[in-house]
Regions:
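N-terminal prepro regions of secreted peptide precursors
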Residues: 4-137
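Cullin-RING E3 adaptor/co-adaptor recruitment helices
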Residues: 131, 138-164
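Short intrinsically disordered terminal tails
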Residues: 1-3, 162-166
């Protein structure tokens, strides 16, 4: 059974490809690994994307279900002061952008460069793909900035956790 993540699905990433869901072979082998380790080899294919999906979905769930006043406490990260609420929002925004960029960069390459006919069909069926492909500037500088912000989002998450556990 393929895992479903409501928050990742809201980004427009199809369930069939996020996480390790794109791998369908060796089911018995994966079941044994899940029994032994609690996860299987699909989770380590692309660890940065697996972590991004985990962080994004958990921060969204925290934001949706938090009963605390997250504006009262603040953390300092990279010389800036963030309330917990601002930090969570910043993490969600930048991690979501990293996930969308990775997914849509693959789509851009596949559906614009390699298979333009399939790309036209995909754009008709999935408006999010069409909008993103039309509006996004495909520059290497964007990729490095998005990746840097994702790395900072991970650091900010650690900073929040240190504050919460102390």
């Amino acid at each position: 059974m393929k895992r479903r993540n409501q928050y990742i699905s809201q980004l427009g990433v199809p369930r069939r490809i996020y996480g390790g869901n794109f791998v369908t072979e060796k089911k018995l082998y994966r079941m044994r690994q899940r029994y032994r380790y609690g996860f299987d080899y699909r989770d380590i294919f692309n660890m940065d994307m697996s972590y991004a999906e985990w962080l994004y979905s958990h921060m969204r769930m925290y934001k949706d279900n938090s009963v605390h006043d997250d504006t009262m406490a603040a953390v300092i990260f990279d010389g800036k002061e963030y309330t917990i609420q601002e930090a969570v929002d910043w993490i969600i925004e930048n991690t979501g952008e990293f996930i969308r960029y990775g997914y849509y960069l693959d789509i851009h390459f596949d559906y614009i460069t390699r298979y333009p006919l399939i790309g036209k069909m995909m754009s008709k069926f999935n408006p999010a793909v069409r909008t993103y492909l039309q509006e996004y500037e495909w520059l290497e500088d964007n990729e490095s900035q998005i990746t840097d912000n994702f790395i900072k989002a991970g650091g900010l998450f650690i900073e929040i956790m240190q504050y919460c556990w102390l």
